[in-house]
């Protein structure tokens, strides 16, 4: 996937996609979904209108039957965003805006919207849709590129965000995963999606050290490629062992 985000969630024959990678990754995401047997996406969430999250979304929206498309109520003055809007129009899709506290079902699992909690002007990252997914005893937290200010707003909305698995915000940037937020999530596992040798230096050492100090097991796409977690509601298994190098 490189320096971008895409997460596929499958449960009881239902599928959900959170983000779709960068502009040049749409076909890669499409091929992965098809390889996984996906024909219909019950939910597509574009966390925020930055290219590394919605770049491939026009391809996904065009190629798959998409039921509910959730994106924040903010526009971005970019060709990438325009491509998504145009594809939505061409397919007759409507945007569902996220409402904090609303819960949706996906098979036997469910997810709750936890962000955005207010309007953030032109700060696209802070508009990120946050989702807490629950399958049986397992909880997974996804916050897009939400940064520290948006994390504070999540902490103040009263929703319990403790989770077994935390998809680390903003590719492991030190502008996110504040100590207070990490303490509230208290994850056992963390997944960092970042491009190998990316120019941003993601994930940042401060975040890795914060996770290490909290005893969290970390998985990294820049070192390990596609990471798969399987939950039956009681047992959680992974397609590989946690990264070792992050402990440097």
Please describe what each predicted stretch is:
Residues 1-248:
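Non-globular, low-confidence helical/coil segments that flank catalytic cores
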